[in-house]
């Protein structure tokens, strides 16, 4: 059992030695030199200015695009307004022409009614003449 205990102790010592080798030693954080900080700040401000300029340019371009779209939409609505005015004018002209034709259309309706009445009278006359003819033939046979 003593040999087993010594083996366990030896294994633990080996593991402890490996753990120490795996641990890195921390170095003290040192501040960069003043010149490095100044250069880094300049670089940061330069890159930030470039970034902000890009963002502002993109926003400005978006607004210009929106302005152009609004102008085109306005022009399209003006065209549609002109078309609507022309349609309205043409409709008024057609209504005036229809009003001018209305007496003639009324006359046509009256004539159509008279023709229908005349046609009915012709059918009645035809029927009456057929009756007379039938009576005449009947009297002739006697």
UniProtKB/Swiss-Prot annotation:
The modification N-acetylalanine is found at residue 2. InterPro entries: BLOC1_su2. The keyword Metal-binding does not apply. One of its GO terms (cellular component) is axon cytoplasm. Residues 1-33 are annotated as: Disordered. GO terms for molecular function: gamma-tubulin binding. Keywords: Acetylation, Coiled coil, Cytoplasm, Cytoskeleton, Lysosome, Membrane. GO terms for biological process: anterograde axonal transport; anterograde synaptic vesicle transport; endosomal transport; lysosome localization; neuron projection development. It comes from the Eukaryota. The keyword Transport does not apply. Disulfide bonds: none annotated. Its main location: cytoplasm. Component of the BLOC-1 complex, a complex that is required for normal biogenesis of lysosome-related organelles (LRO), such as platelet dense granules and melanosomes. In concert with the AP-3 complex, the BLOC-1 complex is required to target membrane protein cargos into vesicles assembled at cell bodies for delivery into neurites and nerve terminals. The BLOC-1 complex, in association with SNARE proteins, is also proposed to be involved in neurite extension. As part of the BORC complex may play a role in lysosomes movement and localization at the cell periphery. Belongs to the BLOC1S2 family. Component of the biogenesis of lysosome-related organelles complex 1 (BLOC-1) composed of BLOC1S1, BLOC1S2, BLOC1S3, BLOC1S4, BLOC1S5, BLOC1S6, DTNBP1/BLOC1S7 and SNAPIN/BLOC1S8. Octamer composed of one copy each BLOC1S1, BLOC1S2, BLOC1S3, BLOC1S4, BLOC1S5, BLOC1S6, DTNBP1/BLOC1S7 and SNAPIN/BLOC1S8. Interacts directly with BLOC1S1, BLOC1S3, BLOC1S4, BLOC1S5 and SNAPIN. The BLOC-1 complex associates with the AP-3 protein complex and membrane protein cargos. Component of the BLOC-one-related complex (BORC) which is composed of BLOC1S1, BLOC1S2, BORCS5, BORCS6, BORCS7, BORCS8, KXD1 and SNAPIN. This is Biogenesis of lysosome-related organelles complex 1 subunit 2.
């Amino acid at each position: 059992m003593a040999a087993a205990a010594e083996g366990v102790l030896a294994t633990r010592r080996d593991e402890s030695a490996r753990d120490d080798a795996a641990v890195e030693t921390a170095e003290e954080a040192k501040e960069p030199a003043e010149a490095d900080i100044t250069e880094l700040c300049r670089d940061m401000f330069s890159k930030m200015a470039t970034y902000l300029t890009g963002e502002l340019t993109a926003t400005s371009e978006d607004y210009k695009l929106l302005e152009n779209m609004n102008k085109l939409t306005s022009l399209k609505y003006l065209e549609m307004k002109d078309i609507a005015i022309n349609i309205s004018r043409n409709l008024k002209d057609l209504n005036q022409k229809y009003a001018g034709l209305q007496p003639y259309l009324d006359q046509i309706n009256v004539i159509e009614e008279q023709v229908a009445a005349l046609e009915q009278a012709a059918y009645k006359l035809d029927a009456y003449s057929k009756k007379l003819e039938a009576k005449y033939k009947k009297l002739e046979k006697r």
